[in-house]
Curated annotation (Swiss-Prot):
Expressed in small intestine. Weak levels in heart and lung. Can degrade fibronectin, gelatins of type I, III, IV, and V; weakly collagens III, IV, and V. Activates procollagenase. The gene is Mmp10. This is Stromelysin-2. The keyword Ribonucleoprotein does not apply. Zn(2+) 2 binds at residues 218, 222, 228. Induction: By wounding. The conserved cysteine present in the cysteine-switch motif binds the catalytic zinc ion, thus inhibiting the enzyme. The dissociation of the cysteine from the zinc ion upon the activation-peptide release activates the enzyme. Its EC number is 3.4.24.22.
Amino acid sequence: MEPLAILALLSLPICSAYPLHGAVTQGHPSMDLAQQYLEKYYNFKKNEKQIFKRKDSSPVVKKIQEMQKFLGLEMTGKLDSNTMELMHKPRCGVPDVGGFSTFPGSPKWRKSHITYRIVNYTPDLPRQSVDSAIEKALKVWEEVTPLTFSRISEGEADIMISFAVGEHGDFYPFDGPGQSLAHAYPPGPGFYGDVHFDDDEKWTLAPSGTNLFLVAAHELGHSLGLFHSDKKESLMYPVYRFSTSPANFHLSQDDIEGIQSLYGAGPSSDATVVPVLSVSPRPETPDKCDPALSFDSVSTLRGEVLFFKDRYFWRRSHWNPEPEFHLISAFWPTLPSDLDAAYEAHNTDSVLIFKGSQFWAVRGNEVQAGYPKGIHTLGFPPTVKKIDAAVFEKEKKKTYFFVGDKYWRFDETRHVMDKGFPRQITDDFPGIEPQVDAVLHEFGFFYFFRGSSQFEFDPNARTVTHILKSNSWLLC
């Protein structure tokens, strides 16, 4: 997902109609809202030089049309009253873009019996009413799959359900009443599968306020692995609306086909199981102990080591050697996947992340303002189109950039490339063959990753001391 948790939606005044051709200018509140909405839910990449061109082909027009198509609006490409009205409605914050009805990689529970725990309660409803709403929301999915659910009262469940306000420890703070209602994570270990409700909402079991049963059933669909649907009748349609009470509620055929593509039909279900061949091919979730596993890039981050692969990364720390597995978008929603290179710049407490001719700076879970920037701002010649690997040597305060069979050295103190570079990799790192996938500097050694192998290089002896599997860092 692509986050896979909900991102905040800012609420701004509605205006009747704001076509892009002349009526909306940069800084107009409706344009600001539209830009924020498209960035969060439609993967819109801000480009100051292009956003406000008054042409039908401008990126913002195309993204507005994409949003209008997905949400079932007339594709005007303009911020008309219907579009603005929908942007202001409460909704789920999982992005709407995506090629499939399930999350990328099709994460799902690898078992049929799933536990859940209600960690705390909203003051808006009696505890037994909350218990009943959650139970009925799970029953919706249980009726059409082989899945069963049971509640536990202590310890860690597969799905941890809680109510919170504002900052609540997962990088996605809630935004107050009437906007983002809740968020959920796809199946997996740790916080994956969990559901968080914004307790600033007025939770009810009625058409007024925000109906807990309907929101819970939607979010639990995410917890089971479903993405958003563009069908308005679907429970997984992203915009909130009250439809009916639990007693009269039935999943749409779109919801049934989506969940059964992951788990199959339940023994008593009359619904049609989606044939495997009808589902578009999906990228595989990488297995950390696959003997052929390679990494896109590797970096340290505040005492941890991050291993990036496709849209995922493993996170290993000295105090917790068991690697954690995450989606890149769960921590940095605006970063691309399939990264080229990454390294930690200790002097700025940031990690620089490279893809193609651009790079981003992240500090903690925040992408820094003013990025992405072009790699040529670092001093590379125009002939360099991308970086293969990068690593920071803390003792010398130098960063090494590897491109093809050459490498550059960057002075992090003076912020310039050192003179005399590029140099041949094999001249200064004997035994290291180009092209390098990733480099890590730990324990006084350089670790060069190439395919499924890594080469431990001693810079003092100028020799390769060990050849290991790339995933040996992941306890494989």
